[in-house]
């Protein structure tokens, strides 16, 4: 599909009637109420509560005033709707500001001032320096004589470096006067969200040009939300407007992620719903039987002789209404509120602010904080994520000679400096490729120095290194490049740029030497993308050895090459290149095919080696998280040896004898199958052995494994704690995440670049690092952090606390609802199983919304352990990963507690107040008071760290309960007139409260004391140590039970196995890190295995979906 945009012609562009109005609003003034209600009632639980509320309107079956259900329902829906309205109002204000911004357009040669929302497709938009681009434009002219302008794209892709944009070749030389009256047509694709591509063609009408077709790329565009910088003015024709711009198409509502805790809460809710139906059926049948056998014998109960057809449904429906409170109506609002607070805690954490850049952490997704505490696998990018992405040129190999090996710095290598001085041909060519085979822009600073603006850190490092070696890239004027070398000036004309792509893994520049007219191809790229295309007869073994050597040192390598072209060869190729560049369909593929025809018979000049240092705290972070039972997979596009050395240096894997690498390689299906089978066999054998085993696989072998041996690879994924996947593409990264998710593991993906976005979005939790490659990953992620080391605190502190708090909040919500419901059920047995409510409507309405909510919301600041203890003992994360605090077993405990407390409240209340002069309202108020007192003590008992706010909320809530009820007791029409005054004046009331609390909490406190004293968990021991102010415990102190084959944690002493299968492949012996971090046989080493290794040894307990 394509569209035609007519330049400066309103009539011809009428069919493209989309204006430039931006709308990110979800609602309008007229559809807000119906649309919001539709969204809320699309959820099953809300439909259920609405049905209950509607049944309450049937006076024959409702046991209480309908307001007791409609009140909380309306309140909760109003809270949700108000939040949506508030968010949408802010979106409206943002849209209004953007739409009403004034811009200049040119019509028929006349400038006009209009609002941005009135721009039409085909209008020529005029921009001045520092203006924001209001829509997607094709650049037509700039104030620069060479047709160049500079834009800042930070709002679009997060990259802060200025980028160059150039006018199409068809517009070069058109003066300002004619520019205003330009006519032509642009053939472009239909709107899409790909900000990296714009495959279009432009044809200007006479008298501007002779109808020649000019191809357009993304470099000829100015995209919406970019800013014009360092350019006096620029103008362009609008091709996409409004929500059809690339930015507008990128906007969208991300698919919500369901946390493991939410899934468990849904299952438990379903179980309670089934239990409720059973109770309703049993009591409904019992009620009808009692009515037919006993009630008609009572003289004071008058039933009609002939009952209507629905008579048998009345009592069951009445019990349905009575038991509907089993499922707490407030749980969703409560969880949404506390989850929002969890996100704010992350953003307010001053210890997660990058001091270098001032970047704070940010939670874009407020709904999944609990999943941080249940992470089992972390899949991480390497460059910019584990490393600093500060590239420094360290070594090189030119013509088989190694430079920089002695002192680790080629820039100070005397031999290299002598070669430059003597004019070595290979060295000069090598430096030339370093200097100009790139997209770097040299800019003159105010101090007169040359500053390089590069889109790639690698290119920046190479250009700077070349300048330090006297090959200085001085300036770029349109297609003319100027280099200064040893006092002489060299000029090149750029004929074509063969851009880098992830498939080609190289880039080339075709230049013409202005001194001798020679046409030269300069290339640089990965070794596998350059060396196979070396000219016949050239020995590349030394270059290959250099790549291998540098990779073993953890350095990033690029091969540089050179080829002189015949003019006829270039001209023939140029025609095909322009044809491919003008295609609208499959342009990228056809360009790559044409480039391949030129990039051959290359003369390999040498190899560069660039250092990318690890970020501060990376080894410590990975070591700590591995102790927490989290498995690590490194997914990188870098070379195998480089990735391995980085993995060694950052504690990703352990050197021999404690660590072992298994290689999966091969170029054919048969080779990969054999290698995979060999590694899988070894992993099965060593699954129960305490050895740190990891596997390594490259992108090619991974592609074959996923296509032909997916089941075996999935088994390997289950068995492996650590994996290093090299030379992988963005799509393969996402595939690996999906494989682990299919096995029901909770995954976290972390990266910093645009190539990590798919992986981040695919994972259960996506974390983006605000790095030097921009903010694309950070914007696509659920959480954004400034440094990798903050991941430790994000998981161990915020993730764990969030899990603990939500586990308590959700189960307590069910507990308090079940408690009141069980009392209603018990009361039915002494009221003829009629479905009569013990409590009045006001009490029921206030119970869930007010009386029992405040203490729970304050529990979001509760901490079972101090942050220091959590960070020092990461092994306790196991309780979250295993779901120990929220599961059917723990829920059964809360269920039993609610039943026990209901029995206590009911029995004591009945025995104390069931006498002739006691009113039913008094009985209900005594029972309700007992519930409130019990719940205050339950919250106090479950609270680990008391603050003034928590004391005020727990005990102040009790005071508030009495204040509210005294107020209602003073109102004659409330139905509670004088009840509270009468009760509180009776000593028996306070004795009853004391008995209820004593009988209800005594066994609970005794059970807790027994557990803490005689069967303490690791957390209990740490809590006792904190309270006593004792020394920091070691892991050995914590481990009180022998290891069982389950997802548990315990220290393991690892020794060198006596007999090692040939399948074991040693780590690189010449690695400096391996030497530095080597351990002798028998050295004890404490680490905690995750479920992946443990479960696999007992029949692979994970249920993987069919892949």
Swiss-Prot record:
The modification Phosphoserine is found at residue 1050. One of its GO terms (biological process) is phospholipid transport. Residues 56-60, 291-315, 828-841, 913-919, 970-982 are extracellular. Mg(2+) binds at residues 752, 756. The keyword ATP-binding applies. The chain crosses the membrane at residues 34-55, 61-83, 269-290, 316-333, 808-827, 842-860, 891-912, 920-942, 949-969, 983-1007. It is an enzyme of class 7 (translocase). Keywords: ATP-binding, Endoplasmic reticulum, Magnesium, Membrane, Metal-binding, Nucleotide-binding, Phosphoprotein, Translocase, Transmembrane, Transmembrane helix. It is a multi-pass membrane protein. Coiled coil: none annotated. It is found in: Endoplasmic reticulum membrane; Prevacuolar compartment membrane. It catalyses: ATP + H2O + phospholipidSide 1 = ADP + phosphate + phospholipidSide 2. Residues 1-33, 84-268, 334-807, 861-890, 943-948, 1008-1107 are cytoplasmic. Its EC number is 7.6.2.1. PANTHER family: PHOSPHOLIPID-TRANSPORTING ATPASE (PTHR24092:SF19), PROBABLE PHOSPHOLIPID-TRANSPORTING ATPASE (PTHR24092). The intracellular targeting signals and lipid specificity determinants reside in the catalytic ALA subunit. Belongs to the cation transport ATPase (P-type) (TC 3.A.3) family. Type IV subfamily. This is Phospholipid-transporting ATPase 2. It comes from Arabidopsis thaliana.
């Amino acid at each position: 599909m394509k569209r035609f945009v007519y330049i400066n012609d309103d009539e011809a562009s009428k069919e493209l009637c989309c204006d430039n109005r931006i709308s990110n609003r979800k609602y309008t003034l007229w559809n807000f109420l119906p649309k919001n209600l539709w969204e809320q009632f699309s959820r099953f639980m809300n439909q259920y509560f609405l049905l209950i509320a509607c049944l309450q309107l049937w006076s024959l079956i409702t046991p209480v005033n309908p307001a007791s259900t409609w009140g909380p329902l309306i309140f909760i829906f109003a809270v949700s709707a108000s939040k949506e309205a508030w968010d949408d109002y802010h979106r409206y204000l943002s849209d209004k500001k953007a739409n009403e911004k004034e811009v200049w357009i040119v019509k028929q040669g006349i400038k006009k001032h209009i609002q941005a929302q009135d721009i039409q497709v085909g209008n020529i938009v005029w921009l001045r320096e520092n203006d924001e681009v209001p829509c997607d434009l094709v650049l037509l002219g700039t104030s620069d004589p060479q047709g160049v302008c500079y834009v800042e794209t930070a709002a679009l892709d997060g990259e802060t470096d200025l980028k160059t944009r150039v006018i199409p070749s068809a517009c070069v030389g058109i003066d300002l006067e004619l520019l205003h009256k330009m006519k032509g047509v642009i053939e472009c694709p239909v709107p899409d969200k790909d900000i990296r591509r714009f495959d279009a063609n432009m044809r200007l009408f006479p008298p501007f040009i002779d109808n020649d077709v000019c191809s357009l790329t993304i470099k000829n565009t100015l995209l919406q939300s970019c800013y014009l910088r360092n350019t006096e003015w620029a103008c362009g024709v609008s091709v996409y407007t409004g929500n059809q711009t690339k930015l507008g198409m990128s906007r969208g509502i991300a698919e919500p992620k369901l946390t493991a805790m939410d899934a468990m809460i849904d299952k438990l809710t379903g179980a309670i719903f089934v239990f409720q139906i059973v109770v309703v059926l049993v009591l409904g049948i019992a009620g009808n039987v009692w009515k037919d056998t006993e009630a008609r014998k009572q003289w004071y109960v008058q039933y009609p002789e002939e009952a209507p057809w629905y008579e048998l449904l009345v009592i069951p429906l009445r019990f349905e209404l009575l038991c509907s409170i089993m499922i707490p109506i407030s749980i969703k609002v409560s969880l949404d509120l506390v989850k929002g607070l969890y996100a704010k805690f992350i953003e307010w954490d001053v210890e997660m602010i990058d001091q270098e850049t001032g970047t704070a952490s940010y939670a874009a997704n407020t709904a999944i904080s609990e999943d941080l505490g249940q992470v089992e696998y972390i899949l991480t990018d390497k460059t910019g994520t584990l490393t600093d992405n500060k590239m420094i040129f360290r070594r090189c190999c030119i013509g088989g000679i190694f430079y920089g090996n002695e002192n680790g710095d080629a820039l100070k290598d005397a031999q290299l400096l002598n070669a430059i001085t003597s004019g070595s041909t290979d060295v000069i060519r090598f430096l030339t490729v370093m200097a100009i085979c790139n997209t770097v822009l040299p800019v003159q600073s105010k101090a007169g120095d040359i500053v390089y603006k590069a889109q790639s850190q690698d290119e920046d490092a190479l250009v700077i290194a070349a300048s330090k070696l006297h090959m200085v890239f001085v300036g770029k004027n349109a297609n003319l490049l100027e280099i200064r070398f040893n006092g002489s000036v060299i000029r090149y004309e750029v004929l074509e740029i063969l851009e880098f792509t992830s498939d080609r893994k190289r880039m080339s520049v075709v230049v013409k030497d202005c001194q001798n007219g020679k046409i030269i191809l300069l290339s640089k790229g990965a070794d596998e993308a350059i060396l196979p295309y070396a000219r016949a007869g050239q020995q590349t073994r030394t270059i290959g050895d250099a790549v291998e050597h540098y990779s073993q040192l953890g350095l990033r390598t690029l091969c540089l090459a050179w080829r002189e072209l015949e003019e006829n060869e270039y001209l023939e190729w140029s025609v095909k290149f322009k044809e491919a560049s003008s295609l609208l369909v499959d342009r990228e593929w056809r360009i790559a095919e044409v480039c391949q025809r030129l990039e051959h018979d290359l003369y390999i000049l040498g190899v560069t080696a660039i250092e990318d240092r690890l970020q501060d705290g990376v080894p410590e972070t990975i070591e700590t998280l591995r102790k927490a039972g989290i498995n690590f997979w490194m997914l990188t596009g870098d070379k195998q040896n480089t990735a391995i050395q980085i993995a060694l240096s950052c504690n990703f894997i352990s050197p021999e004898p404690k660590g072992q690498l298994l290689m999966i390689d091969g170029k054919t299906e048969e080779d990969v199958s054999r290698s995979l089978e060999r590694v899988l066999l070894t992993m099965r054998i060593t699954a129960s052995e305490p050895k740190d085993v990891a596997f390594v696989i490259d992108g090619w072998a991974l592609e074959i494994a996923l296509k032909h041996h997916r089941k075996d690879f999935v088994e390997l994924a289950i068995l492996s704690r650590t994996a290093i996947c090299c030379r992988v593409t963005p799509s393969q990264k996402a595939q690996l995440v999906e494989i682990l998710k299919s096995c029901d593991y909770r995954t976290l993906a972390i990266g910093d670049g645009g190539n990590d976005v798919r992986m981040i979005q695919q994972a259960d939790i996506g974390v983006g690092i605000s790095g030097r490659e921009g903010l694309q990953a950070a914007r696509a992620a659920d959480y954004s952090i400034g440094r990798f080391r903050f991941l430790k605190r994000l998981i161990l502190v915020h993730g764990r606390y969030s899990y603990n708090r939500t586990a308590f909040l959700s189960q307590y919500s069910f507990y308090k609802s079940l408690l009141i419901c069980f009392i209603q059920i018990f009361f039915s047995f002494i009221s003829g199983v009629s479905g009569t409510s013990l409590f009045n409507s006001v009490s029921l309405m206030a119970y869930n919304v007010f009386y029992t909510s405040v203490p729970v919301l304050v529990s979001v600041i509760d901490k079972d352990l101090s942050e220091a203890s959590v960070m020092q003992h990461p092994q306790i994360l196991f309780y979250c990963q295993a779901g120990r605090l929220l599961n059917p077993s723990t829920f059964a405990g809360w269920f039993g507690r609610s039943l026990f407390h209901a029995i206590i409240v009911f029995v004591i209340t009945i025995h104390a107040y069931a006498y002739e002069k006691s009113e039913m309202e008094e009985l209900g108020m005594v029972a309700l008071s007992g519930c409130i007192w019990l719940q205050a003590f339950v919250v106090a008992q479950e609270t680990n760290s008391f603050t003034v706010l928590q004391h005020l909320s727990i005990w102040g809530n009790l005071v508030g309960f009495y204040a509210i009820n005294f107020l209602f007791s003073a109102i004659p029409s409330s139905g509670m007139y004088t009840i509270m005054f009468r009760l509180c004046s009776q000593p028996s009331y306070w004795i009853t409260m004391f008995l209820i609390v004593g009988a209800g909490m005594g066994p609970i406190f005794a059970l807790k004391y027994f557990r803490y004293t005689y069967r303490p968990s690791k957390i209990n021991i740490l809590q006792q140590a904190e309270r006593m102010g004792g020394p920091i415990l070691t892991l050995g102190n914590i481990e009180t039970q022998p290891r069982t084959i389950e997802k548990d944690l315990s220290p393991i002493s690892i020794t060198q196995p006596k007999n090692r299968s040939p399948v074991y492949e040693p780590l690189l012996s010449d690695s400096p890190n391996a030497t530095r971090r080597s351990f002798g046989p028998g050295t004890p080493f404490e680490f905690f295995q995750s479920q992946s290794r443990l479960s696999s040894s007992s029949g692979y307990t994970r249920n993987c979906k069919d892949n």
